[in-house]
Amino acid sequence: MGIFDKFKIGFKKSASAFTSGLRDIIIKKEIDDKTLDQIEEYLIQSDVGLVAAKEIKKIIAEEKIDPKKDIMNEVNLILKNYIITLMKPLENEGFFNKKEKLNAVLVSGVNGVGKTTTIGKIGKILKSNGSKVMFSACDTFRAAAIEQLESWANKIDVQITKSAQGSDPASVAYNAIEEALKGGFNHVLIDTAGRLQNKKNLMEEYKKIANVTKKIDPDAPHDVILVLDATSGQNVINQVEEFNKIIPITGLIMTKLDGTAKGGILLALAKKYKLPIIALGLGEKEDDLQIFNAEKFAEAFTQIN
């Protein structure tokens, strides 16, 4: 199955819902001021964000679409091109090909976004690219989290460093990086406990993990990935804002895009923060984490290829 097919199938529910709603506005209508306002309102309701919605509305207005043409198709083409222009600079396929030296990756996010599963899937992609990968189980609050990461490590045959439940997460991360440097590893993926962005003590602990890794390598963590749940809608904006204040984020991964989530939130994030998008979670299977590609995302989102 090709990458477009995987994006298309993964996005089927959210893309179908989006285009269906848009079609209801446009069908059998000319693009007049009232229709443009309805399109803008619909885009905002679809989590695209106010700024992007206004820009798209302006482009549609300036295009002066011939009413004899397939208006829905013309609007979708405008959307597709807008998405590609906005998001192409945010592709970061190179993340999966870093092998020159150890890349310590801090993976964070609020509770329930699928961090541990995402780490397992990242690990599988990295290993398939020839990288030597280690997992570091720094979510020491939940025994289940350690067990889940260990299960992934066994499944894809990568090394894991762990400690007993209740151990200091920062020390676990430190030991992992130290061991990885000695063992010639390319990547250490550091799993952290889910934490609400408004809980100061938990966010301080998260910062401590990053600071401790710097004792081994001043540039560590080399990547800081925030995992987001697409079903959270506009809440993810606040999550990016708060996590980015503590430790600058180098990349985003959006999960749960295979359901009825409004994929438009990715446009809002791209417009506001311009952070690289590492990958998208399009299902529960091992291979359902797809490296982000702006063109394939745009094609799947608008259902145009």
Residue ranges and their predicted role:
Residues 193-195:
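Short glycine-rich anion-binding loops that position phosphate/pyrophosphate groups of nucleotides
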Residues 50-52, 142, 258, 286:
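Short hydrophobic/aromatic residue motifs in ordered secondary structure
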Residues 12, 27, 44, 65, ...:
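Alpha-solenoid HEAT/Armadillo repeat architecture
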Residues 148, 169-183, 198-303:
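Conserved catalytic-core segment of NTP-binding enzymes
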Residues 1-19:
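N-terminal accessory targeting/assembly segments
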Residues 17-138, 145-166, 173-190:
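Primarily NTPase-proximal linker/entry elements flanking Walker-type ATP/GTP-binding cores
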Residues 11, 47-49, 110, 139, ...:
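Residue-level signature of catalytic and energy-coupling elements of molecular machines
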